[in-house]
Amino acid sequence: MSTITIAWIALPFFVGFSIYLLPKLDRYLALVVAVASVAFGLQQVLNPISETFALLDNFGVTLIIDSLSGYLILTNALVTLAVILYCWGTGKSSFFYTQAIILHGSVNAVFICGDFISLYVALEVIGIAAFLLIAYPRTDRSIWVALRYLFVSNTAMLFYLIGAVLVYQTHHSFAFSGLQGAPTEAVALIFLGLLTKGGIFVSGLWLPLTHSEAETPVSAMLSGAVVNTGVFPLVRCALMVEDIGPMLQIFSIATAFLGVVYAIFERDTKRMLAASTISQLGFVLVAPAAAGMYALAHGLAKATLFLIAGNLPSRNFKQLQQNPIALPMWIGMAIASLSISGLPLLAGFGAKVSTIDLLGSWQKTAMKIAAVGTAIVFAKLIFLPIARPSEPSEPRKRKFGFWAAICLLLVSLVAASGLSLPGYTTANLIKSLATIAQGWLIYGFVFKRFALKLPRMPEQLEHLIGTMSLTLTLLFWMVLA
């Protein structure tokens, strides 16, 4: 198994650089890498084997592979495969496929990292590859958004690196388990870096602009897979070190509510989806034992929604209310939205049930309220007007690659629901349907007619950096407490 694992993790980097030598085969080589990752991730999900590899020595690179890794690898693989299919006939250059596959491989590397320094290297490569993909259109706007992302990411990783060095100074090891007994400042610095990288709470306010302004396939990769790279190490550490669990739950619940509030009042479809990503990351992080399944359900649904949103006649909700959407497009959007809302027979139902069942009383109540907020958010998409056969809808003709990508993701959403069959009890079914109904009623009677423009000042670069300082102070106090 170790030989297969090493070959699998090296394959994206080998193929990524080989694409430059064989540019005519770029799409096919990228497809092979994505399919290989689907096979590897599926194997780990269906037949989980927990293994730990020390590649160099006790202080070197450590890899940990288990069912949690499997869920996240499968998420990354399916999202990447869908993006490759989506881009199949769009004329993307070899440079795009190279960066997409290197990004894919780096994200996979994060999901099997077992030490802080290997994680640092993988996260830095992700930052560079994501920067190049965001800047791919080469417009002034895209270049600025990419530079903003890179600056925030690198600043966060500087804090993280200092914390990792302090852990090594204490234990003479970079292993995640070294967080137990590490100095207060080490825990605070590492958490600040990962909270920012993962888009958690106010540290994640860089996310709406970045994900909404990137090209459609890049947005799908960022929200569907890349954001998990900041959350995964926090989940892994929480499973290893019980003391940090309560602190992470507070951040998770605050994140879920912050994202929901921003998403409810957002008037732009892509910004709404990006804000909801912040909220859903709170759900992923709040119950570490169920994080893998929730990340899979969210990643598949969110990638679907970003791919569809990029092909709607407008990004403005007011204009979409006046322009009916073609029925096939609406069906895809509705299925993905219902999955995130927690409808039975879709992956989101089992993920939400598993997550909420693991929480304490007050945490459970808070996340149930956040779940109602999620239903309100996605009611905005579900209740958009549908074009009748006799009515004209948006005139675009969509290529085969678009529908292949959407079908892959939707089929995966339905199939993934089979991974959580024990959650299908009468009580859970009633609670799920009641939550969605409450959200729809509140949307129909309150938020459909109520508009509020939230300030975007906290998203400005100088405020994002300033927020890091305030968050670091808060983390110090929470760790000391």
Protein language model features and the residues they cover:
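Hydrophobic transmembrane alpha-helices and their helix-loop junctions in integral membrane proteins
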Residues: A82-T90, S94-T98, I102-S118, A129-P389
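Alpha-helical transmembrane segments
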Residues: I9-F13, A30-G41, A77-L78, I101-G105, ...
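Juxtamembrane membrane-water interface segments that cap and precede transmembrane helices
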Residues: E51-I64, G204, A351-S361, S420-T426
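Transmembrane helix-loop-helix hairpins at membrane boundaries of multipass inner-membrane proteins
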Residues: M1-K92, Y97, L205, F476-A481
